[in-house]
From Swiss-Prot:
Described purpose of this protein according to its UniProt entry: Transcriptional activator which binds to the enhancer of the T-cell receptor alpha and delta genes. Binds to the consensus sequence 5'-AGATAG-3'. Required for the T-helper 2 (Th2) differentiation process following immune and inflammatory responses. Positively regulates ASB2 expression. Coordinates macrophage transcriptional activation and UCP2-dependent metabolic reprogramming in response to IL33. Upon tissue injury, acts downstream of IL33 signaling to drive differentiation of inflammation-resolving alternatively activated macrophages.
Protein name: Trans-acting T-cell-specific transcription factor GATA-3
Domain observations: Binds DNA via the 2 GATA-type zinc fingers. Each zinc finger may bind either adjacent sites in a palindromic motif, or a different DNA molecule allowing looping and long-range gene regulation.
Region (Flexible linker): 288-316
GO annotation, cellular component aspect: chromatin; nucleoplasm; nucleus
Tissue specificity remark: T-cells and endothelial cells.
Residues of the signal peptide: none
Zinc finger (GATA-type): 263-287, 317-341
Organism (species): Homo sapiens
């Protein structure tokens, strides 16, 4: 068979599955693209010849005795998934991966791709499988290989999402593991609403992961790692007053609670006003006033109830033996005395003499003070004012009766010549001043 120099260029790039006549889907279940038809596959005898040709078309001795055994020894099974790089940064929600462009940038620096003009021998000992098919889209890769690492790590900030070509090399497997550990540093607690939204987007992307998609999205989107803006841009409500109404007036402090207070004198627990003694102890209003007026503690013995008028009917004065008085009093011994004897004893500290006793009760006419007299005069003048003025009902009725005979449409001179007395008498009105007096005052 005649061999040309152009054949090694495309033969060296094909997968062994192609050379053996097998469909590529049997080795790559995740990859669904194929650029070769079954009719174009070369025959096994042609493959045996082509494997013993170098890049310049010269025949070289075979390394293996059989081409089929050489194929088996040179190409390990494709189910070794540990050699396939699975970068953790391929997130399903990032639409900037465009079909073959995203993986194409990764494989540019990869030793898996062989140049058509390369001088490297075809019998290299690379453990990884050779890339013969064009790279699949990001969705098919995520559904086939990268599904374990696609959603197990939290999304990273946008600055770390840019594709790194070094992650796709076989020697950077350790660095990929280290990057996966560093991804845990960017774990941000998400609100409940954003968690639900993220889970919904993950479910939708997982459903679309099995099918190939090459839709191009020129506008990049950020992963849902950003928390709510209200929690970061605005201070908490506790710094502004504790509530949205914190900008208003502050609530007034509550009044002092009187629970637990007790008067140290009488033991009262309820009083309209709490007072304090000289030592700072609480006193009820009654004990506090008594201590303030008398300088001593209020006596705890309740005074005897005053007898009603029926019970005092037979009461007599212990000094003068009278039974009629305007006010009953008590002496130092507690005996009831009349008003006259009680006042006399209060003023002179001696009992009232019996010679001063009178049959009738003497009353006095209290003199009115000058202030009360002045108020009484003003009150009387105000009472007399409506009687003399023309605003009283009698004057108004007379005036209306005098106007009743005038027609409402007649213009009589009587209305103009006869003025209505609408002013008070001359005693309360001011008389007109003569112009001459004004000139005299000005001159």
């Amino acid at each position: 068979m005649e061999v040309t120099a152009d054949q090694p260029r495309w033969v060296s790039h094909h997968h062994p599955a192609v050379l053996n006549g097998q469909h590529p889907d049997t080795h790559h279940p995740g990859l669904s693209h194929s650029y070769m038809d079954a009719a174009q596959y070369p025959l096994p005898e042609e493959v045996d010849v082509l494997f013993n040709i170098d890049g310049q078309g010269n025949h070289v001795p075979p390394y293996y005795g059989n081409s089929v055994r050489a194929t088996v020894q040179r190409y390990p099974p494709t189910h070794h998934g540990s050699q396939v790089c699975r970068p953790p940064l391929l997130h399903g929600s990032l639409p900037w991966l465009d079909g073959g462009k995203a993986l194409g940038s990764h494989h540019t620096a990869s030793p898996w791709n062989l140049s058509p003009f390369s001088k490297t021998s075809i019998h290299h000992g690379s453990p990884g499988p050779l890339s013969v098919y064009p790279p699949a889209s990001s969705s098919s890769l995520s559904g086939g290989h990268a599904s374990p690492h696609l959603f197990t790590f939290p999304p990273t900030p946008p600055k770390d999402v840019s594709p790194d070509p070094s992650l796709s090399t076989p020697g950077s497997a350790g660095s990929a593991r280290q990057d996966e550990k560093e991804c845990l540093k960017y774990q941000v607690p998400l609100p409940d609403s954003m968690k639900l939204e993220s889970s919904h987007s993950r479910g939708s992307m997982t459903a679309l992961g099995g099918a190939s998609s090459s839709t191009h999205h020129p506008i990049t989107t950020y992963p849902p790692y950003v928390p709510e803006y209200s929690s970061g841009l605005f201070p908490p409500s506790s710094l502004l007053g504790g509530s949205p109404t914190g900008f208003g007036c502050k609530s007034r402090p509550k009044a002092r609670s009187s629970t637990g207070r007790e008067c140290v004198n009488c033991g009262a627990t309820s009083t309209p006003l709490w007072r304090r003694d000289g030592t700072g102890h609480y006193l009820c209003n009654a004990c506090g006033l008594y201590h303030k007026m008398n300088g001593q503690n209020r006596p705890l013995i309740k005074p005897k109830r005053r007898l009603s008028a029926a019970r005092r009917a037979g009461t007599s004065c212990a000094n003068c033996q009278t039974t009629t008085t305007t006010l009953w009093r008590r002496n130092a011994n507690g005996d009831p005395v009349c008003n006259a004897c009680g006042l006399y004893y209060k003023l002179h500290n001696i009992n009232r003499p019996l010679t001063m006793k009178k049959e009738g009760i003497q009353t006095r006419n209290r003199k009115m003070s000058s202030k009360s007299k002045k108020c009484k005069k003003v009150h009387d003048s105000l009472e007399d004012f409506p009687k003399n003025s023309s605003f009283n009902p009698a004057a108004l009725s007379r005036h209306m009766s005098s106007l009743s005979h005038i027609s409402p449409f007649s213009h009589s001179s009587h209305m103009l010549t006869t003025p209505t007395p609408m002013h008070p008498p001359s005693s309360l009105s001011f008389g007109p001043h003569h112009p001459s007096s004004m000139v005299t005052a000005m001159g």
